[in-house]
UniProtKB/Swiss-Prot annotation:
This is Translation initiation factor IF-2. InterPro entries: EF-G-like_DII, EFTu-like_2, IF2_II, IF2_N, P-loop_NTPase, Small_GTP-bd, T_Tr_GTP-bd_dom, TF_IF2_bacterial-like. The lineage of its organism: Bacteria, Bacillati, Actinomycetota, Actinomycetes, Mycobacteriales. One of the essential components for the initiation of protein synthesis. Protects formylmethionyl-tRNA from spontaneous hydrolysis and promotes its binding to the 30S ribosomal subunits. Also involved in the hydrolysis of GTP during the formation of the 70S ribosomal complex. GTP binds at residues 474-481, 524-528, 578-581. One of its GO terms (molecular function) is GTP binding.
Length: 969
């Protein structure tokens, strides 16, 4: 603890209580726990200076006219260091060398020679320059009896008279020592006043030489080896040198508390701390560099030696460069790292101390220091990377990567990370990670462009009645499309492959309610189980749901799913019991079954309207439409503002060969016009053309109107929100951001998590089936991909969709499939141009499907065919060894009796001895019955056999078995 001091010791030294000293330390930004804590030497020095400045007089006494010399005359180099005793005035008669050392005293007027050093930075005046030039020519002078006494200093020629003693300077930053080589001819620069730096001096004498070192303004010789009074030469001329003092002759360090105090001089200049004796004008802190440079030297501004334990480590006596007398240059001993001195520590700023204090409390994961939070909520987008997380918490991404590696996850800084990993990492650092939902993220994106979605602009007077949007839902083959055909008086069902709806259709029909004509918008959704997402989108975009249930079939799984979608979207349901004209129809049974799902008929006291219809015969269709309109008028407020920018939803989208990307859009509010700039999901464009369900052009689409929009630059996703913006530039920026977010989320979802524990298993060879999906519209491709990814056939085979798109199979798809060994699945599309020829040449398999479940079944069979076969053991029979015949050619021959089953030649066998397995994998190499070779011997017959294992004994049991391939489920 060299250089350190305890708080209670400092308090006793300064004459204050420990409590007051602790309060002072707290004001200075030092973190000290108690009075027994230690503080560093720089902190103790600041405390002494602080209390010294408080006890010093406010204003120094005015000096007389003759007070021309600076305070702080240098003592003789040979004088011993004063001890901690009461100082005597230095202006008295000549004392012994121990008493000649000057001490800081209160400034008072006096003659040219003033006592008491006041170490201040050297500030040579401008008239000093001529003398500095002539100084190297002056010869070294020996001390004479008539010379100035030690501790005194003559006024420099041409220097202005000092008006008073300079107050003690504040400690400042220490410049690196220049010229620490005693043999260097390069002088040390002056601190903070480089313009007044003296010129180059002569070569330094060696450590044992006592000759003077000529130089401009260098008035302090090197400390001598023998103490003795040596007069200091006038500043500006050379001073006599002498041998270096021995460490034993150095006096103990004086007690700063017992010394007279002085008023500190304000300003940024650096200098020595109070209480240290000796030093030239501008002398530095005790044992440290003075005002000029750190290290001894007699130049103006030279200090009393090298810093204590600083750059000159290892000087005997605990600090390099401490002179034996005032004004002497620090010796070269210890200047080059010789051990013996404690290393000097620089002062730390409050920010550094605060950072160190925070790092002490920072959590460590596997030895990695991480920032520590206070439970803050960090919002991250789905699929964010560690770089995004590190930017939020102001951390190093490399540290997060290493921390995740220690937690068993191998990711890179720019790789998308799934939600669970982000939450786990955040909890380790005391952060609450919230993965922003896509809806919230999209809302924040639109808010950044001053856009909102889902709200009508204006007040109540701007709202107008709009037609209800009705979605027809139900199980497959229950008659949904037939019902819409009957309503529209068209045959849409025959256009669908297999009679199964595989798209969402949107139509607007005119119906009559009493004497009033009313418009109703119908949305037809698929009923197959693969189209769950389509049904969910239909439920979200609708006002009323018609649940079609076949009277002869009852409630089916997709019926229940449709009910759940409608109830989740808080949509009222009207039940249409279809096929009442068929044999075995039981509408009452349907009503009873639906009560289990919260749909209670009105005749049973509920609030759900049931209508028995026959879509094929056209029975009660008007009653169903009337029920829909009554429900809409009674339960819903169907109004929207048509005088605003249009907002809607893309129900379906596909790529048309002649028209390009086409989206079926349902307008929810506002009016969509030709020429509007639009954005839907990650697709944007300008409305070039709008077509209704009859193929007629539409110039403006009002709320609840379904239209086909032509003009997108790419195919939007099914279910994406459509928004009209002011400029194409804004639409493009929104689409680009959504596209980037979509890619990140897809990468995070598709990334296979590989932890350190299952690294060996991950490195094993696994079979992978690569697919490229092409469909006629976005919804079909989405449904097909979700259905295929849901196939579970085991961990040995993995399905991977490397590309997906809308439109025909192109040559680009074939080239990608050839490079990645993939199969192309075309759903309701065919190959374009020379794609088929290229596929045949490259050996790429293209499969075409028109019904979705056929594609699912074939892909599942292909995956199962890629699985490694599973074998099961089937026991054939058991035989007991009754005798052993030894042969020099074939070895031991076992004479056996077949106890059960049969024994076959070349079958695998297991040798048991006292019910203990002796040989596990042996083979029956030969089998004979009497003298004939046979392939099989049945139960109850004797035989002779040889095994691939010769250590057999009488009484052993041979168990024959075979491995048969087990079919995959």
């Amino acid at each position: 603890m060299a250089g350190k001091a305890r708080v209670h010791e400092l308090a006793k030294e300064l004459g204050v209580t420990s409590k007051e000293l602790l309060a002072t330390l707290k004001e200075q930004g030092e973190f000290v726990k108690s009075a027994s804590s230690t503080v560093e030497a720089p902190v103790a020095r600041r405390l002494r200076e602080s209390f010294a400045s408080k006890s010093a007089p406010a204003n120094g006494a005015k000096p007389g006219p003759a007070a021309s010399a600076r305070p702080g005359a240098k003592p003789t180099p040979g004088g011993p260091r004063p001890g901690p005793r009461t100082p005597a005035p230095a202006a008295s008669a000549p004392q012994a060398p121990a008493e000649q050392t000057a001490r800081p005293t209160d400034a008072r007027p006096g003659p040219a020679v003033k006592p008491g050093p006041a170490p201040t930075p050297a500030r040579p005046a401008a008239p000093e320059a001529p003398a500095a030039k002539a100084a190297p020519e002056a010869p070294a002078q020996r001390p004479t009896p008539g010379g100035p006494r030690p501790g005194q200093q003559q006024q420099r020629p041409g220097a202005p008279a000092q008006g008073g003693p300079r107050p003690g300077p504040k400690p400042g930053p220490k410049t690196p020592r220049v010229g620490n080589n005693p043999y260097s001819s390069q002088p040390a620069p002056e601190r903070e006043r480089p313009a007044a730096r003296p010129g180059p001096g002569g070569p330094r004498p060696g450590p044992a030489q006592g000759g003077p070192r000529p130089g401009p303004g260098q008035g302090a010789p090197r400390p001598g080896a023998t103490p003795g009074p040596r007069p200091a030469a006038a500043q500006g001329g050379p001073r006599p040198g002498g041998p270096r003092p021995s460490p034993g002759s150095m006096p103990p360090r004086p007690n700063p508390g017992a010394m007279p105090q002085r008023t500190p001089r304000p300003g940024p200049s650096a200098g020595g701390r109070p209480g240290r004796p000796g030093g030239a004008p501008g002398a530095g802190r005790p044992g440290g560099g003075g005002g000029g440079y750190r290290g001894g030297g007699g130049a103006p501004g030279a200090g009393a030696g090298a810093p204590a334990g600083g750059g000159f480590r290892g000087r005997p006596g605990g600090g390099g460069g401490r002179p034996g007398g005032p004004g002497g240059r620090g010796g070269a001993a210890g200047a080059f790292g010789r051990p013996g001195g404690a290393p000097r520590r620089g002062r730390k700023s409050k920010r550094q101390k605060r950072q160190e204090y925070d790092s002490m409390q920072a959590p460590s994961v596997g030895g990695v220091r991480l920032p520590r939070g206070n439970g803050e909520i960090i919002r991250l987008a789905r699929g964010a990377s560690l770089s995004d997380f590190a930017e939020k918490i102001d951390a190093n991404p490399a540290a997060l990567v290493q921390a995740l590696f220690n937690l068993g996850e191998m990711v890179t800084a720019t790789q998308s990370v799934n939600d669970e990993t982000l939450e786990l990492l955040g909890s380790e650092m005391n952060y609450v990670v919230q993965v922003v939902s896509p809806e919230d993220e999209d809302r924040e994106l639109l808010e950044s462009f001053d856009l909102t979605y889902g709200e009508d602009e204006g007040d109540e007077d701007d709202l107008q009645v709009r037609p209800p949007v009705v979605t027809v839902m139900g199980h497959v083959d229950h008659g949904k499309t037939r019902l819409l055909d009957t309503i529209r008086k068209a045959n849409v069902r025959e256009g669908e492959a297999g009679g199964i709806t595989q798209h969402i259709g949107a139509y607007q029909v005119m119906t009559h309610l009493g004497d009033e004509d009313r418009l109703i918008t119908f949305i037809d959704t698929p009923g197959h189980e693969a189209f769950t997402a389509m049904r969910a989108r239909g439920a979200k975009a609708t006002d009323i749901a018609i649940l079609v249930v076949a009277a002869d079939d009852g409630v089916m799984p997709q019926t229940v799913e449709a009910i759940n979608h409608a109830q989740a979207a808080d949509v009222p349901i009207v039940v249409a019991v279809n096929k009442i004209d068929k044999e075995g129809a039981n509408p009452e049974k349907i009503r009873q079954q639906l009560t289990e799902y919260g749909l209670v008929a009105e005749e049973y006291g509920g609030d759900t309207m049931f209508v028995d219809i026959s879509a094929k015969q056209g029975t009660n269709i008007d009653a169903l439409l009337e029920a829909v309109l009554l429900t809409a008028d009674a339960a819903l407020d169907l109004r929207a503002n048509p005088n605003m920018d249009a907002q809607g939803v893309a129900i379906e989208a596909h790529l048309d060969r002649g028209r390009g990307p086409v989206a079926t859009v349902l307008i929810q509010r506002g009016t969509l016009r030709v020429g509007d700039s639009i954005v839907a999901g990650d697709a944007y464009g300008r409305v070039r053309r709008m077509v209704d369900e009859h193929g007629e052009d539409v110039e403006a689409a009002l709320p609840s109107r379904p239209v086909q929009v032509v003009g997108f630059t790419s195919v939007p996703g099914a279910g994406d929100n459509l928004l009209v913006v002011d400029e194409d530039r804004i639409a493009r920026q929104i689409a680009d951001r959504r596209n980037a977010r979509k890619r990140n989320a897809l990468a995070a979802r598709s990334r296979k998590r590989i932890s350190l524990e299952d690294l060996d298993a991950a490195l094993k060879e696994t079979s992978e089936l690569n697919l490229i999906l092409k469909g006629d519209n976005a919804g079909t491709v989405e449904a097909l991909e979700e259905a295929l990814m849901g196939i579970e056939v085991g961990d040995e085979v993995r399905l991977r969709v490397i590309d997906r798109g809308v439109g025909g199979v192109t040559e680009t798809n074939v080239n990608l499939a050839s490079a990645s060994n993939a199969i192309i699945i075309g759903f309701n599309v065919r190959a374009e141009g020379k794609a088929t020829e290229l596929a045949n040449r490259e050996g790429v398999d293209i499969r075409y499907y028109s019904v979705i479940y056929q594609a699912i079944d074939e892909i599942e069979k292909a995956l199962k065919g890629m699985l490694k076969p599973i074998y099961e053991e089937v026991e054939l029979g058991r035989a007991e060894i009754r005798a052993i015949f030894r042969s020099s050619k074939v070895g031991n021959i076992a004479g056996c009796m077949v106890l059960s089953g049969s024994v076959k030649r070349n079958a695998k066998a297991r040798l048991l001895r006292d019910n203990v397995v002796v040989a596990e994998t042996t083979t029956i190499s030969s089998l004979r019955r009497e003298k004939d070779d046979v392939t099989e011997v049945r139960e109850g017959f004797e035989c002779g056999m040889t095994l691939t294992y010769n250590d057999i004994k009488e009484g052993d049991i041979i168990e024959a078995y075979e491995l048969r391939e087990k079919p995959r489920d």
